[in-house]
Swiss-Prot record:
PANTHER family: PHOTOSYSTEM I IRON-SULFUR CENTER (PTHR24960:SF79), PHOTOSYSTEM I IRON-SULFUR CENTER-RELATED (PTHR24960). This is Ferredoxin. [4Fe-4S] cluster 1 binds at C8, C11, C14, C47. Pfam families: Fer4_7. One of its GO terms (cellular component) is cytoplasm.
Length: 55
């Protein structure tokens, strides 16, 4: 599953790109529900700061 690092700038690009929508705004960065993540990499491909990383 992917997770979002502290590099996240909360731009929302990953949330709109994800085909299964496990991404949501968190307290300071977006968060990914690891159980719902299908590991497609769409979030990582669109992120301008490479915040989504694969576990």
């Amino acid at each position: 599953a992917y997770f979002i690092t502290d590099a996240c700038i909360s731009c929302g690009a990953c949330e709109s790109e994800c085909p299964v929508s496990p991404i949501s705004p968190g307290d300071s960065v977006y968060v990914i529900d690891a159980d719902a993540c299908i590991e497609c990499g769409a979030c990582a491909n669109v992120c301008p700061v490479d915040a989504p990383q694969q576990k």
